[in-house]
Structure formats: structure tokens, C-alpha cells
């Protein structure tokens, strides 16, 4: 029974990731006035399965100078963390109802740094190591802004439980009242998932492919799956925090459809950003966080802390 539950949990996420790669290639294709993949199956719908078969049937090679055990563990850890992040998400029901769901998600996203660092270090390649160091610095930096934004949202929500967010947003979405936080959160999730225009970890012109340059076949596919699973998970969290998952007890299937639609639209925006914007320079990336986002998020957090205290001092009106 445990195995069946595990498969029912993992397979839909992996299928969503597989078709996200197809959607990305199609969207980028049409934005660049070309078709995208259209040969494998009708309209190219079987392309993800062809890619999976190709990657997982090739021989997984590793450099002679690499640290073998760490080199193998890194992609497994990356995919495991990416799949575990989904457990406390209410869609509309959770797999694991945690009281500290948001702290759990923040901790796991912090752990994902280790898989990147290990892969860069174990590859014993200067390109992989530079890519890994960039990724670690970027991820750790943007987690600061993500944590402060989450703290502000939790002050509004009054709980660290994700399920209560739908009750908090019963009358209106939080994106309406906290739109500066929502904008900073969305940009920070782009940086956290190493997506364009913050994809400095895989700057093709200087680092070839970044921290996974020495990976091939199955292990490379695991990193790929982990990256796209994180993208969908981050957009699902954005939907829960700012776009109020619907609360209709009698129409639970509509709740799920609404949640999926919002998440898909946010994910499509990720692809739109990739097609539209050039890559940031590294110093611009860091200045954006430390000189712009950090002061603004701290100011907003102090505002949400001080507002209830200030209002509680007002004497009751007759």
C-alpha cells in the first residue's frame, strides 16, 4: 500500500514536469517565430517520453578524477528534495498536514543548495565548481528575501500552516493588499530556481552548462527534473500565498482546477520572462537583493508588525 501511495504521489509530479518541458519548448518556439518540437507524436506531444527514454537508456558516465559517491548522491538528493517540497502543499488537501508547513518548505529549499555544491565539487572541474559557487551564493542570498516575505505573510495569516491561507483570503486575494511583497516574491522565486534572467549558474558563454557540465544520461535528467519540479512547486506556493486557493467544500474538484490554472499561468509567465529578458550581470543580481529587496522587505515586515500594535492602542469608538 505504501508503494502504491508513493507512486501515486511521484508520478503526477513527474508527468507535470515532463509536459512543462514540452510547453516551454513550444512557447519559446512560437515566441521566436518557429514551431518547436512537432515530429514525435501528434503536435510533438510524445517528445517528453522520447527524451526520457533517450536519457535513461544512455550510459551514465563520470570523470575519472571525480569523487564518485558524492557525484552520484548529488542528483538523487536534488530530485528527492524537489519531490518532498510538495508534501505540505494544500491542493486543496495536503499529503502531510504540518503545523509548520512554511518553515518545512524554507528548510528544504535551503537543503537544495547542498546538492548543487556537491555536484560542482565532486565533478572536479573548474567550470562546474564556478557554476556551483555562483548558484550557492545566489540561492542563499535570495532565500533571505524569501524568508522575510514569508514572515510578513505569516504575520497576516497568524499561522505557519498553509491550509489556513484559503481562510485568510476568503474575501480578497493577498496580492491586492501586499502587491509589493508579491512582486518581490515572484522575482526571488525566479532567482531561487536559477531561471532566466538569473540563470548565471549555466552561463553558456563562460561556463558551458554550469554545475552539471560533467553529468550525462540519468543523473543529468535527475537535475533537470528537480529544476522543473521546483519551478512548479514555487508557483504553487505563490498561488497559495497570494492568489487565494478557492474554498468551496461542496465543489472540491473546482478548487483543484482553479489551483492548477493559477499555477499554470504563473509558470507560463516564467517562460515568458525567459523569452523576453537578457541575463543579469552578477553584480546587478546581488545589488538587486542586498540594496533593493532586503531594505524593502524589512520595511514591509516592520509595517505588518507595528500596524496591529498601533491599532490596538486606539481607544474604542462609541
Swiss-Prot record:
Core subunit of the mitochondrial membrane respiratory chain NADH dehydrogenase (Complex I) which catalyzes electron transfer from NADH through the respiratory chain, using ubiquinone as an electron acceptor. Essential for the catalytic activity and assembly of complex I. The chain crosses the membrane at residues 3-23, 70-90, 100-120, 136-156, 172-192, 223-243, 251-273, 294-314. It catalyses: a ubiquinone + NADH + 5 H(+)(in) = a ubiquinol + NAD(+) + 4 H(+)(out). This is NADH-ubiquinone oxidoreductase chain 1. Pfam families: NADHdh. The keyword Cell membrane does not apply. The gene is MT-ND1. Keywords: Electron transport, Membrane, Mitochondrion, Mitochondrion inner membrane, NAD, Respiratory chain, Translocase, Transmembrane, Transmembrane helix, Transport, Ubiquinone. Core subunit of respiratory chain NADH dehydrogenase (Complex I) which is composed of 45 different subunits. InterPro entries: NADH_UbQ_OxRdtase_su1/FPO, NADH_UbQ_OxRdtase_su1_CS. It is an enzyme of class 7 (translocase). GO terms for biological process: mitochondrial electron transport, NADH to ubiquinone; mitochondrial respiratory chain complex I assembly. Its EC number is 7.1.1.2. PROSITE patterns: COMPLEX1_ND1_1, COMPLEX1_ND1_2. GO terms for cellular component: mitochondrial inner membrane. Belongs to the complex I subunit 1 family. It is a multi-pass membrane protein. GO terms for molecular function: NADH dehydrogenase (ubiquinone) activity. It is found in: Mitochondrion inner membrane.
Amino acid at each position: 500500500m505504501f508503494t502504491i501511495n508513493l507512486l501515486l504521489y511521484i508520478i503526477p509530479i513527474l508527468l507535470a514536469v515532463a509536459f512543462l518541458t514540452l510547453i516551454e519548448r513550444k512557447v519559446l518556439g512560437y515566441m521566436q517565430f518557429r514551431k518547436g518540437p512537432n515530429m514525435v507524436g501528434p503536435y510533438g506531444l510524445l517528445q517528453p517520453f522520447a527524451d526520457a527514454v533517450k536519457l535513461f537508456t544512455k550510459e551514465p558516465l563520470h570523470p575519472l578524477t571525480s569523487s564518485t559517491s558524492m557525484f552520484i548522491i548529488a542528483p538523487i538528493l536534488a530530485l528527492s528534495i524537489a519531490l518532498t517540497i510538495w508534501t505540505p502543499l494544500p491542493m486543496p488537501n495536503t499529503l502531510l498536514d504540518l503545523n509548520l508547513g512554511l518553515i518545512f518548505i524554507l528548510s528544504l529549499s535551503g537543503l537544495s543548495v547542498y546538492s548543487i555544491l556537491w555536484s560542482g565539487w565532486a565533478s572536479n572541474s573548474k567550470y562546474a565548481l564556478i557554476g556551483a559557487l555562483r548558484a550557492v551564493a545566489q540561492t542563499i542570498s535570495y532565500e533571505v528575501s524569501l524568508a522575510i516575505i514569508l514572515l510578513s505573510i505569516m504575520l497576516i495569516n497568524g499561522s505557519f500552516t498553509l491550509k489556513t491561507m484559503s481562510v485568510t483570503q476568503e474575501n480578497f486575494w493577498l496580492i491586492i493588499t501586499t502587491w509589493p511583497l508579491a512582486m518581490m516574491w515572484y522575482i526571488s522565486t525566479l532567482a531561487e530556481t536559477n531561471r532566466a534572467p538569473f540563470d548565471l549558474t549555466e552561463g553558456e558563454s563562460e561556463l558551458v552548462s554550469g554545475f552539471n557540465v560533467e553529468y550525462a544520461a540519468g543523473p543529468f535528467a535527475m537535475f533537470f527534473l528537480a529544476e522543473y519540479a521546483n519551478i512548479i512547486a514555487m508557483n504553487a506556493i505563490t498561488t497559495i500565498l497570494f492568489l487565494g486557493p478557492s474554498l468551496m467544500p461542496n465543489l472540491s474538484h473546482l478548487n483543484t482546477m482553479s489551483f492548477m490554472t493559477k499555477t499554470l499561468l504563473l509558470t507560463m509567465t516564467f517562460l515568458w520572462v525567459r523569452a523576453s529578458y537578457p541575463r543579469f550581470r552578477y553584480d546587478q543580481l546581488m545589488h538587486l537583493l542586498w540594496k533593493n529587496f532586503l531594505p524593502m522587505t524589512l520595511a514591509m515586515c516592520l509595517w505588518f508588525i507595528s500596524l496591529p500594535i498601533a491599532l490596538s492602542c486606539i481607544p474604542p469608538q462609541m
